[in-house]
Regions:
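Hydrophobic alpha-helical segments, especially transmembrane helices
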Residues: 15-16
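Bacterial N-terminal signal peptides
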Residues: 19-29
Length: 255
C-alpha cells in the first residue's frame, strides 16, 4: 500500500494563518503608496504638455523649470517634482499666478516663489523645505502637513490659511500675516516671527520653542496647550489677551 496516500494533508499552522492577514495588509500598503515612494521616483512623460492654466502635470518632473510671470492658475501638479522651480524673486518681474493650484504631496525643495500668487492653492503634504516665499500671497491656501523648514516667507499673507500639523523649523516669517489661520499643532521651533500678525489665529498645541515674537500681534489667538513659551522671545509683543509682554515681565505666557 502506498503510505504517501494515507497521510493526512498538512494543515496550516496557527502562525501561518495569522501571517496571512498581515501579508495582505502589507501588500495593500505597498499598492496604495505613491509612485516612487519606494526606490527612485517614477514620473510620467510630460514633455508634450504645455504649462498653462488648469493644465494636468501631476506626477511630472518639472524640477529646475522657469515659470516667472506665467499664468498657471488651477494647475494640477500634485505628486510632481518642482524642486528649484524658479517663479522669480525679483519685485520688478511679473508675478507668477498659481492661484487655486493643486500641488499636494509634491516636492518643492528650494523653489523660488517670491511674490507668487498662491491664494486658495492646495499644497498639503508637500515638501517645501527651503522655499523662498517672500511677499507671496497664500491667503486661504492649504498647507497642512507640509514641511517648510528653512523656508523664508517674510511679509507674506497667510490670512485664513491652513497650516495645521505643518513643520516650519528654523525658518523666517517676519512680518508675515497669519490672521485667522489654522496653525494648530504647527512646529514653529526656532523660526523668526518678528512683527508677524496672528490675530484670531488657532495656535493650539503649537510648538514655539525658541521662536522670536518681538513686535508680533497675537490678539485673540488661541494658543491653549502651546509649548515652548519659556524659551520664546517676547518684546513689545501684544499677547492674546491684549496686554503687552513688556508689562507682563517680558512674556505672554499665561496671557
Amino acid at each position: 500500500m502506498n503510505i504517501e496516500l494515507l497521510r493526512r494533508p498538512t494543515r496550516p499552522t496557527r502562525r501561518g494563518l495569522l501571517a496571512l492577514p498581515l501579508i495582505g495588509l502589507l501588500w495593500m500598503g505597498v499598492a496604495a503608496a505613491p509612485v516612487g515612494a519606494a526606490g527612485s521616483p517614477t514620473y510620467r512623460d510630460c514633455s508634450q504638455i504645455a504649462l498653462a492654466p488648469n493644465a494636468d502635470v501631476h506626477r511630472c518632473d518639472l524640477s529646475d523649470a522657469t515659470i516667472i510671470g506665467l499664468d498657471l492658475h488651477g494647475i494640477y501638479a500634485s505628486w510632481s517634482d518642482l524642486s528649484r522651480v524658479n517663479g522669480g524673486c525679483d519685485p520688478d518681474l511679473p508675478r507668477t499666478n498659481l492661484a487655486g493650484a493643486r500641488i499636494a504631496r509634491a516636492i518643492l525643495v528650494d523653489a523660488k516663489l517670491c511674490d507668487a500668487i498662491l491664494s486658495d492653492a492646495d499644497l498639503h503634504g508637500s515638501d517645501m523645505s527651503g522655499v523662498a516665499l517672500e511677499d507671496a500671497s497664500l491667503n486661504r491656501a492649504n498647507l497642512s502637513w507640509t514641511i517648510l523648514s528653512g523656508s523664508q516667507a517674510a511679509f507674506a499673507p497667510f490670512v485664513d490659511a491652513n497650516l495645521s500639523n505643518a513643520t516650519w523649523r528654523d525658518g523666517f516669517a517676519n512680518g508675515a500675516t497669519f490672521d485667522g489661520a489654522d496653525l494648530h499643532r504647527i512646529d514653529f521651533r526656532g523660526t523668526d516671527l518678528r512683527s508677524a500678525s496672528f490675530v484670531g489665529s488657532d495656535l493650539r498645541y503649537a510648538r514655539l520653542n525658541g521662536v522670536d515674537l518681538t513686535d508680533a500681534d497675537l490678539t485673540g489667538a488661541n494658543w491653549r496647550q502651546a509649548t515652548g513659551l519659556a524659551s520664546a522671545t517676547f518684546s513689545n509683543t501684544i499677547c492674546p489677551d491684549g496686554t503687552n509682554s513688556d508689562a507682563n515681565g517680558g512674556t505672554c505666557a499665561g496671557h
